[in-house]
Every structure is written in C-alpha cells, then in structure tokens.
Amino acid sequence: MSDVSIARTELEPSVGKILPEKHFTVTDALLEDYFEGLALERGPFDRGETPVPSMIATDADNYFSEGAFRQQRGHLWMRQEWRFTEPLQRNETYVTQGRIEDIYRKRDRTVVNTAVTLSDSQGAQILSFNHHQSFLLDAPVEEVQFREPNKKPGMRKFIVPDGEPLAGFDCDITLEMCGQYFHGNKSYHTDLQASKELGFGDVVVGGRMTMAYIGHLLDGHF
C-alpha cells in the first residue's frame, strides 16, 4: 500500500476512532442566530423566564469533517439521540469530545454513528449525544431521489402513544431563515449551488433546524 493510500485510509472513519477535543461557547451571537433563524419569540429567555434552549447544543455537533467519508455526494443526517444532565449556560465555554462508536448499513447507505460528550470547565458532563450520518458509498448518483414516505416498502404505521399531547405550531422555513440559523455559512442547507454539487435538486433544510423545533416544544412543555 502506498503512502497516499495509507493517508487516505487513515482519514476515513473507522470504529473506535477518537476525534479531536474542541470547545463550544454559548455566545450571544449564537443565541441570536438560533432565535432569528427559527423565527422563535425570545422574550421569555431575555426576561430570565426560560433557560438556554436545549437545542442550542446542536452547534456543538461539529465533527463532520473528522467523521465523514471522502465520498460525500448525497450524504444525509439520519437521526440523533440526546441525553441532558443540566441546562447549558449563557456565555459559558464547554469541552466536546467525540468518538466513532459504530459504522453500519441501512438499506443502500453506510451510516457513521458518532458519540459526543460535552463537559463544563470543572469536567462535569452536561450532555451527550449520538449523531447518525448516512453516506452513499456503493453507487453515488447524479441526483439524489427522495421517496414519498407513504410509498416506502415496509412502511411502519405510527401509533400515537398514551400520554399528554404536546401543543404544536406551524412555521414556514425560508431560505433566509436557513442562512441565519447556520450563521451565514455556505452549505447545502443554505445555498442552491452548494446543494446541487452534492446531488440534491434544492436546498436541504438542515436536520438541526427540525430538531430545534422539537426541542422548543419539549422545553416549553417540561
């Protein structure tokens, strides 16, 4: 194996790979992009009636470049698991540590499961999460085709569980909102050309945004 091949292999994700330690700060600019990008009312937070939104932590999920395959055309977020110990604090800096926990197959995709912990300055763990990112490695396509949910084979029927229902809300996500939520960074979540370069026909609304709306509902309920 050549030195180039060895270097490329080392750059690809592998189970057990330790990712570099990073720092994450809950800045005022971050909070502004969160509330404005999601078009959420921030009055209760500014008045001290609610804590820092739980899903501000999605910005600590920044290990894509270290945990992604080189073939990124058509890659998509698949799912996320969150475990919170206590709320994040405004203007506090936290340490993130990551590790690739698993790589598995899901239909025609290869999924990288990255486990991340976030700790405060005293070393106490504040939260942890697992990010599942999927990649098309077998036969990358020119344009990614999405299936209609009701046409998927073996589609599971969702049964509403017992319990107290959460009050929902409607929100139309605009391209401008996507741009602000992702801090003006150009990506397939904010820019049509960047999206087409990855095989998508339109800008892809970031999974972090949809998770943030769910987090907003849960924060308000509990």
Residue ranges and their predicted role:
Residues 1-2, 121:
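Polar low-complexity intrinsically disordered regions
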Residues 2-79, 140-222:
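Hot-dog-fold acyl-thioester-processing enzymes
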Residues 78-122:
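Hydrophobic beta-sheet segments that form the core/acyl-binding groove
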